Amino acid sequence: MELNPVDSILSDRIQAIVATEKNIDDMMKCAREIMQDLGKEKQISKNKMDDNANSFKKLITQVENELSAQMQYLSHVCVGSSHQGSTFGVLQNSLLAQSGLSSLHSELAQILKNIEPPTQEVDEDNEDEEDSGDADMLEETPEDVVAPRTTSSSATTSDGGSGGADDAASSSAPRSQEERRSTEEEEGEQMEN
């Protein structure tokens, strides 16, 4: 069974903490010995006192260094900076990307909604007949003159026909001012007759 590199790093950190705990125990024993020696009526030799003081200082330095290293590691883990085994930064970047993507989708939907008004479905027969003439007219007319296309979804005639060519003229609104004028003139002539 192979150990994962992250597992070995974590086990090393745990072993370092255990070693620090043992050093703290040794430091407490050393301090207890010094206190007992000072409590005795008999004078302690200078060499023994220096040895006890040096071992105590050495243990304090080791414990302090190891605890500082562990605290620094934990502070990096808490703020999300890169460290061994951390997924906080990756998760944060993923969430940020997802929120950016969703905001882009909503902005795009809003733009499309403002640019293209909703269109109703056109009857297949009407669409085929209108497309041949509409494409030429759209190329010739400026954009600001083009009117939105309106269609009727129910194209039936009174005599039961399919509603193809007879209703083609009435199924879409005029696309330019010229076409509007010609349509109005035709309607005016029909009204007079």
Swiss-Prot record:
Region of interest called Disordered, as start-end residue ranges on this chain: 115-193
Example of a GO cellular component annotation carried by this entry: mediator complex
Q: Which InterPro entries match?
A: Mediator_Med11 (IPR019404)
Secretion signal, residue range per the UniProt entry:
none
Report the Pfam families cross-referenced here: Med11
Task: Report biased composition (Acidic residues) as residue ranges.
Answer: 121-143, 184-193
- Coiled-coil segments, which residues? 31-68
Which UniProt key words apply to this protein? Activator, Coiled coil, Nucleus, Transcription, Transcription regulation
Q: Give the primary localization class.
A: nucleus
Name recorded for this polypeptide: Mediator of RNA polymerase II transcription subunit 11
Q: Which organism is it from?
A: Caenorhabditis briggsae
Please state the gene responsible for encoding this protein.
mdt-11
